[in-house]
Design a protein with these regions (language model features):
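Short linear functional motifs in flexible/disordered or boundary regions
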Residues: 21-22, 61
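Intrinsic disorder/low-structure terminal segments
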Residues: 8, 14, 88, 123, ...
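N-terminal secretory signal peptides and thylakoid transit peptides that target proteins
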Residues: 1-18
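Flexible, low-complexity segments enriched for small/polar residues
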Residues: 37-38, 45-46, 50-166
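A general structural signal for short secondary-structure junctions and capping/turn motifs
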Residues: 7, 39-40
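Short, functional C-terminal segments
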Residues: 170-193
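C-terminal segment of classical bacterial N-terminal signal peptides
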Residues: 23-28
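Boundary at the C-terminal end of the N-terminal hydrophobic targeting segment
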Residues: 31-33
């Protein structure tokens, strides 16, 4: 029989606390709203987020008022990668993507109650660029101690989207990444006397 280490004790109590919290979640209104979201709404919300971070010539970028001639995050396939990454990060019911979409859309509706109906079913995807920035500002400014995970999510979600977008061939083309530096003429002989 193995000894109970401090680390394994903390892991087990953390899982127990999380299980207790998850058991109570179905009674929370935002969870009911999140689980009732259609997959299209999740996809639209994540696409609105992708266009916010890496705009392109797509419909989501046009709706927010920030476009580029070069292909953006939508063309790079970042929406699917983001949904897959979030849902694999913490396998849960509802999926993390659904929860993120509910939080972004809920904050968007608080910001502009008349935003839906719009071009998209997703309130967040219908926002202008500056309003999307305000959604993230509000989420990061929540001062409630219990909202630490929400602040963490809002603070790290843009970086995750950028990473996923620029880790693709389209992203490398956008950033003018020319490949690894090994073997370039300016480095040949640099480390030799």
């Amino acid at each position: 029989m193995s000894a109970l280490t401090r680390r394994s004790f903390l892991e087990r109590t953390g899982f127990l606390a999380a299980a207790g919290l998850l058991a109570q979640l179905p009674s929370v209104p935002w969870v009911r709203a999140a689980t009732s979201l259609k997959p299209d709404l999740n996809h639209q919300t994540m696409s609105g987020l992708v266009a916010f971070i890496v705009p392109g010539p797509d419909a989501y970028s046009r709706k927010q008022g920030q476009t580029t001639k070069e292909p953006g995050g939508i063309a790079a396939g970042t929406t699917k990668a983001l949904i897959d990454t979030l849902d694999l990060f913490i396998p849960s019911t509802p999926p993390l993507t659904t929860t993120v979409a509910a939080v972004l859309n809920g904050t968007a509706v608080q910001l502009d109650p008349g935003i839906v109906p719009g071009t998209f079913d997703s309130a967040f995807a219908n926002l202008a660029f500056s309003q999307k920035a305000e959604v993230f500002r509000r989420l990061e400014a929540i001062d409630n101690p219990e909202a630490g995970a929400l602040r963490f999510l809002a603070g790290n979600l843009p970086g995750l989207v950028a990473f996923l977008a620029y880790a693709t061939p389209t992203g490398r083309k956008l950033s003018r990444y020319s490949g690894v530096a090994d073997g370039r003429p300016e480095f040949k002989g640099y480390f030799h006397a």
